[in-house]
Amino acid sequence: MLDNQNDLQFLFKKALYFLKFRPRTKKEVFDYLLKKIRNTSYSTDDIKKVIEKLKEMDLLNDKKFIEDYVSFYSKNNPKSKKVLTLELLKKGVNKNLIDEYFLRNQLDEEELAFLLLKKRFQRWALIDKKKRLKKAFDFLGRRGFSFETVKKVIEKLEESGKIELDI
């Protein structure tokens, strides 16, 4: 294990480069640095030291990562809470942090699904009603929305006069 701060500069610079493009989780940075130290004299303890230094500098913060991730996907490519949770878990975010975030910040899945479907129904205007309905269920289902949520959203769209379906 390398104790000298200068010896850790290599890893620190690699981590900064990796963080330059977008926010990352601790696990993503750890895995990235682990690949970089293969066939070198660095150890996982050195990686942990670098990660601690990044956390102290507030360059690595899983809570902030969750906020940024959910905010980005709520605006740009809405997904259900279930899908967002699974994606965050894949990125190595602690389940307790995710649950804590969603307890503090409610995600209005119906509203997200409504906005998504409203846009899509304009594209599907020339398709017959039955196919549009199937497309709506498939489209929102792939984004993790429940059957009940999809059904409510379609009824809401129908009531608002945006679409006409014979359910």
Briefly describe each language-model feature range.
Residues M1-I167:
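An alpha-helical, amphipathic repeat domain used for nucleic-acid recognition
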